Amino acid sequence: MEIHSSVVPAITNVKSLDEIRRSAKFHPTVWGDYFLAYNSDNTEITAAEHEEHAKQKEMVKKLLTLAPNDPTDKMQLIDAIQRLGLQYHFEKEIQEILQSIHANFKADKDLHTVALRFRLLRQHGYNVACDVFNNFLNKEGDFMESITNDFEGLLSLYEAAYLGTHGEEILDKAIEFCSFHLQSSLPQISNVSLSKRVEEALYIPTHKSLTRFGARKFIPIYEEDESHKKVLLNLAKLDFNIVQKIHQKELSDLTRWWTKLEVPKNMPYSRDRLVELFFWIVGVYFEPQFTTARRILVKAISMASLIDDTYEHATLDELKVLTDVIERWDTNAVIKDWPPYTQMCYKYLFDTYAEIEDEVEERESYRVQYAKKEMQKLVRAYFDEAKWLYKNYLPTWEEYMKVSTVTGAYMMLSTTSLVGMGDLVTKQDFDWVVREPLIVRASSVISRLMDDLVGDEDEQKPSGALCYMKQYGVSKEEACAEVRKHVKNAWKDMNQECLEPRPASMQVLTRVVNLGRVINLLYTGDDWYGNPLGSKEWVKMVFVEPLTI
């Protein structure tokens, strides 16, 4: 593509503009160059580790293929494999077992068995009916009090209910019923492993949790379970440590890339969050084969974060010119008399996307063009929000959602997440994702509104709740309840889109759903991205501390 050099007119009266310039005070990075210490020597996976890993995998594969005919035993084994973060090794075997269970469906009176089967089948795309839970209702249509003492069954029903779609009122009832009784029964649960599983589920249910982070928390809980399978536990620990070394090496390389940019020096108003962003993207795909995809997506989300902070810091005149430069993707633009940070902003962006182009094969270069267009769309939306702020304009709820679901960056990330996935995706997948299908819109709604719910009270930017309050004349509590309802409905949209017949492959859909899962963790109770102290322990668990074998 031919690029023409251009000169952009200078912005005048910079001193007076500085007086109205907005700025935010973000907590400095808590990691600095810590991960630079992880080099090829201390992240090397030894031959002994490879050999033991292969041996343990074969043993677990035999467990799956030679599992007894009892469907409940098979399902519990599959559930443990998934929660230990090992599913990616046994996808074929798991799919064959679930096909058989689905084809040979038998009614069951055991709540745990019914709920576990429902959850596993729905997780794998089977559109099984929720009326399997009717047997546990009384004549009034409420759940029977007799099941409240079945803690394992109650937990299984609670977990299964989060796979619900629109119109499945019995699952909405199940969440309310189970959460109340599990919470009130916690002191009575003597089984330590079960008690901890209940606590974790009440905080974030399995369906909404991250595979990698969830596995790190589940492994010690599984170890405390007297019925655990030793070979499965051993593989889970070894696999976790091996993948951790891969992530440490990637994070070391990315830290080196980030350090060379000198962001804190050149853009001191911005968030320095490379490590937290890597945690974010590992939530999208943690598996070893996605190293390139992770590197690309971390770089893209890092640029989005810098641009977001710049659009909240710069003046409207500066942003108008910056938006124009990015809209034209003018890599040779020369902007006279601009503050240095504005020029660094688009230089970082263009250089980073040039690096991304180098990451993919020539036959896949079209993918980067899709990614660029989504970034341009994101920048236009940032500019729309900036105009609202400078004009003191409070948008309607509809106007707000149209723009803010873009500035949440999940439309851009959904597209860019596919760029480095190799042969697992096609051009048709990119054509599909940029049309903003329902699952992408739903993930974007979750991203924006979860952020809004924990946003600072004194933020200058309008929030969904504020727009709803002013437009409909309701209280803050009522507006927040409406926002939560939209988040709940968005999860149901995503659940529906993952059932057969699917609009895209599960490899593609999983990236979009995982983005929703990341935001659910980061914005449950607080903004753990804006406040890195809160997520520091999570980072240590996943990237620093190996498991004891």
Swiss-Prot record:
Keywords carried by this UniProt record: Lyase, Magnesium, Metal-binding
Positions bound to Mg(2+) 1: D308, E312
Residues that coordinate or bind (2E,6E)-farnesyl diphosphate: R271, D308, E312, R448, D451
Sequence motif: DDXXD motif, positions: 308-312
Gene3D superfamilies: Farnesyl Diphosphate Synthase (1.10.600.10), Terpene synthase, N-terminal domain (1.50.10.130)
EC top class, as a word: lyase
Cofactor note: Binds 3 Mg(2+) ions per subunit.
Pfam families xrefs: Terpene_synth (PF01397), Terpene_synth_C (PF03936)
Cofactor: Mg(2+)
Enzyme Commission number, as recorded: 4.2.3.75, 4.2.3.100
Chain sites annotated for binding Mg(2+) 2: D308, E312
Record GO terms (molecular function): germacrene-D synthase activity; magnesium ion binding
Pathway: Secondary metabolite biosynthesis; terpenoid biosynthesis
InterPro entries linked to this entry: Isoprenoid_synthase_dom_sf, Terpene_cyclase-like_1_C, Terpene_cyclase_plant_C1, Terpene_synth_N, Terpene_synth_N_sf, Terpene_synthase-like, Terpene_synthase_metal-bd, Terpenoid_cyclase/PrenylTrfase
Record keyword Magnesium present: yes
UniProt binding sites for Mg(2+) 3: D451, E459
Catalytic activity: (2E,6E)-farnesyl diphosphate = (-)-germacrene D + diphosphate; (2E,6E)-farnesyl diphosphate = bicyclogermacrene + diphosphate
Keyword match Metal-binding: yes
GO biological process terms held by the UniProt record: diterpenoid biosynthetic process; sesquiterpene biosynthetic process
Role this protein plays: Sesquiterpene synthase that catalyzes the formation of sesquiterpenes and sesquiterpenoid alcohols. Converts farnesyl diphosphate (FPP) to germacrene D. Converts FPP to bicyclogermacrene. Germacrene D is the major product.
Domain notes: The Asp-Asp-Xaa-Xaa-Asp/Glu (DDXXD/E) motif is important for the catalytic activity, presumably through binding to Mg(2+).
Family: Belongs to the terpene synthase family.
Name of the protein this chain belongs to: Germacrene D synthase
Phylogenetic classification of the source organism: Eukaryota, Viridiplantae, Streptophyta, Embryophyta, Tracheophyta
